Regions:
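Thiamine diphosphate
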Residues: 1-165, 170, 181, ...
Length: 315
């Protein structure tokens, strides 16, 4: 594939918050936990310091503050690393935001193994599982800059709690901003193919694209499906792919337990039993190292997707 621009989706998050405010959305407020430089909400703070609230390293309290602001008519985007937003503050997210179904948007950056050198303590590979278990919570993991920007806008426009996962790592931008339509709960078919389906989310979507190109050179035609919304899940696109391809690979930068794979398997087991193989973090903790090296170490790459496809097709 030709070289393309790379942007971290956390940058997309910060830029879009700033753009929304500039467009006159005066109900938009942003909260952070002493991490505005890392989550990129500092972009918003520079132009609207009166609408940016730094709650310090007290993520649970920050979720409560966001809940309170939402009851007063504001639309809070509450920001921290995924490990702290989904992990440390889970009780407050569940009880203060999820239970009353408040209009709070959680912008969780630094998700997954690709946090890199920060190591296992900061590499949150359990956030999908935690957040999708909360009734009424929408869970989104965009694949690139274009999709991330669209996801932030869609989250702002909808009513109800939303969890958005963004990455630290700069990843290829493969969507065309002028010809891209984002809809919460609707997956996107990226490539044609009926030999095998690769259902991916987040940065694994581009790895699936690369894998599909490599497989095509061997005469294997893989259908790549981008599931940016993990909840609510687009069952229709999954069932169609499973029916027409007969074999499915899921790919996610998350523990294979509790995330996209289990969501897909739940649909297929009930409605269309289909062979499925899981590409993801295999129920282990991460370690410290350069992001791309870690993705390769844990099998979160195109090479592993291709290997898995060969194993399924040759079985």
């Amino acid at each position: 594939m030709a070289d393309v621009k790379k942007i971290a989706t956390r940058e997309s998050y910060g830029n879009t918050l700033k753009e929304l405010a500039a467009e006159g959305h005066d109900d938009l407020v942003v909260l952070d936990a002493d991490l505005a430089a890392a989550t990129k909400t500092g972009m918003f703070r520079k132009v609207h310091p009166d609408r940016h609230f730094d709650c310090g390293i007290a993520e649970g309290n920050m979720m409560g503050v966001a809940a309170g602001l939402s009851t007063m008519g504001y639309v809070p985007f509450v920001s921290s690393f995924a490990m702290f937003a989904a992990g440390r503050a889970f009780e407050q997210v569940r009880n203060s935001i999820g239970y009353p179904h408040l209009n709070v948007k959680i912008g969780a950056t630094h998700g997954g193994i690709s946090v890199g050198e920060d190591g296992a303590s900061h590499q949150c590979c359990e956030d999908f599982a935690l957040m999708r278990s909360i009734p009424g919570m929408t869970v989104i993991c965009p694949a690139d800059d274009v999709e991330a920007r669209a996801a932030v806008r869609a989250a702002y426009a909808m009513e109800g709690p939303v969890y958005l996962r963004f990455g630290r790592l700069a990843v290829p931008v493969f969507h065309d901003a002028d010809n891209y339509h984002f809809e919460i709960g609707k997956g996107e078919q990226i490539t044609e193919g009926n030999d095998i389906a690769i259902i991916a989310t987040g940065l694994m979507v581009n790895e699936a694209r690369i894998a599909a190109e490599q497989l095509a050179a061997e005469g294997i035609h893989a259908r790549v499906i981008n599931i940016h919304t993990i909840k609510p899940l687009d069952e229709e696109i999954i069932l169609k792919a499973a029916k027409e391809c007969g074999k499915v690979i899921t790919a996610e930068e998350h523990n294979v337990i509790g995330g996209l794979c289990e969501a897909v398997c739940a649909v297929l087991s009930e409605k269309l039993p289909t062979p499925v193989r899981r590409v993801g973090v295999q129920d282990v903790f991460g370690c410290s190292g350069p992001a791309w090296d870690l993705l390769a170490k844990y099998g979160l790459d195109a090479a592993t997707i291709c290997k898995t496809a060969h194993e399924m097709l040759n079985k």
